[in-house]
């Protein structure tokens, strides 16, 4: 029953996104995805050169997509972005964005990003009360550089 409910929810969301028609520009894409819970981040493997796909939490802020790497930045996708900062984001409704990644190191900005994640994601907020570092990873700004075909 849970699987059926989840499948129905995905179908409804996908149908609603598709009903809005094609994405006109980057601003339109950001507006459509901002309330989604996850997005697919597609990086190029730093060792293999192959496509590496990872669903990831994100926040849209100031026309940029913000993501965070857990494990103190020792995740494949984060290390891939350090080597090749150009990536692709895929979202529900056939939304595709080409992005350029920049790690965030300014302490004030990092703390602000952590607050945005805790505000958007209840799970991170609840776990933070128990000492979890979820929602407090190494932040990366993904600046949209255009819509993508694939």
Where are the predicted features?
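Short, basic/aromatic recognition patches
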Residues: 23-34, 38-39
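Covalent nucleotidyltransferase core used to form phosphodiester bonds in nucleic acids
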Residues: 29-31, 66-79
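Positively charged n-region of N-terminal signal peptides that target proteins for export
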Residues: 1-3
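Short beta-strand segments
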Residues: 36-70, 87, 97
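Sec/Tat signal peptide C-region and signal peptidase I cleavage site
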Residues: 15-19
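Bacterial N-terminal signal peptides
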Residues: 5-14
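Extracellular/periplasmic catalytic domains that process cell-envelope and extracellular macromolecules
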Residues: 32-33, 50-52, 59-60, 122, ...
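Short, structured beta-strand-loop surface elements
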Residues: 20-21, 72-150
């Amino acid at each position: 029953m849970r699987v059926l409910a989840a499948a129905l929810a995905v179908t409804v969301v996908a149908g609603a996104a598709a009903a809005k028609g094609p994405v006109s520009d980057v601003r339109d894409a950001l507006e459509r995805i901002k309330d989604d819970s996850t997005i697919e981040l597609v990086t190029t493997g730093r060792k293999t050169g192959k496509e590496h796909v990872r669903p990831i939490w994100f926040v849209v802020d100031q026309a940029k997509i913000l993501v965070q790497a857990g494990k103190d930045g020792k995740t494949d996708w984060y290390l891939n972005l350090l080597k090749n900062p150009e990536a692709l984001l895929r979202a529900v409704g056939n939304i595709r964005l080409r992005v350029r990644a920049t790690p965030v190191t300014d302490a004030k900005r990092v703390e602000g990003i952590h607050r945005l994640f805790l505000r958007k994601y209840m799970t991170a907020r609840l776990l933070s009360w128990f000492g979890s570092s979820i929602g407090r990873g190494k932040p990366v700004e993904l600046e949209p550089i255009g819509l993508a075909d694939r």
